[in-house]
């Protein structure tokens, strides 16, 4: 096994209406994918930064995110964390591994020799964390249905690990609770055959006066446990702070 993405679940008391939490999240942590689902006995609230699989204009896109630092309290601190992230050999090697996995996933449902990395090792910043991000695009092979095209990238390597199946077996052994919504896919399918999905990250479930948030970190041979633990806390902060 090269990497396992282990997660932990945070639990808090539900102190306000779920829709009000979502409204606050839109202001405090705007993200590429914002969503609110109101079911009979629970709500899903999310602000995900990461594409799972997208099919648009006959292009398949995956956008792996791997490598995280907290945001700095000042511009100077922010720049320090950004530079520190981009020179961290462990984070860079992890990202490269997951970028290669993303290229392989997209390649399964793309025409031969059309896979391109259109963005590589860029920094994206959100309210509480910053990430290393790359973008992979391929020309969609139409012999694959939209559902098979989605499954080519599911589950994402950035929330499971590599190789995926063994990583998921270890996750099942070590995590105390089933992930349920966390790390799954949320999105839509259009009548024209296109679709867009994100990974259920920075996502909370509100039910029975409880508020659950789950966050993970990629564990490799040279991981430092305290840093990985702090990474999960930093990722959960945006949602937990929206309760206030």
Q: Where in this protein do the model-derived segments appear?
A:
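Extended alpha-helical targeting/anchoring segments
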Residues: 1-244
